[in-house]
């Protein structure tokens, strides 16, 4: 990495990040730091703040502190995979779902409805054998790599061409 920048609204976390060698050029505002704030809000904000300070990056990565079992080799594997696909907009860490969403339900009042009303040869997914359902992956939020212009121009971190990075073992475990 050219730079390691911590994006936080916490002075305590900023001090910890600085202690371990990260830059904290500014603190995030509370408006983009709420529990339900979309990531794109703070990502676009920090990229624009850096541009205003004369620092621009073609590519950025999000490494969340809540993934403590992600290793340097994990990041190296992901970077290699991203570099091998120059037309991709981003790379996102995923893991195979342990519970298939085709077997999930939404409860409304005294009734429930399938979350995903898909069928497999006219059999609803919720009534199909697991082996007959497509493999489904869930993002584990441990690692993302993306092109800066995608975040700044399309209001999305992922873009449309996304490389799956399948986490191994506890790499994607979120605490």
Which ranges hold each PLM region?
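Conserved core of the sugar-phosphate nucleotidyltransferase
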Residues: 41, 68-160
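A short acidic, often aromatic-flanked loop/helix-cap motif at beta-alpha or helix-coil junctions
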Residues: 31-35, 99-100, 170-173
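Short phosphate-binding loop-to-helix
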Residues: 5, 11-61, 69-80
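Short, high-confidence coil segments that cap the C-terminus of an alpha-helix
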Residues: 1, 55-57, 85-88
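Structural beta-sheet core signal
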Residues: 6, 62, 90-92, 164
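Short active-site oxyanion
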Residues: 1-5, 89, 170-171
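Conserved active-site beta-strand element of glycosyltransferases/polysaccharide synthases
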Residues: 163-166, 173-174
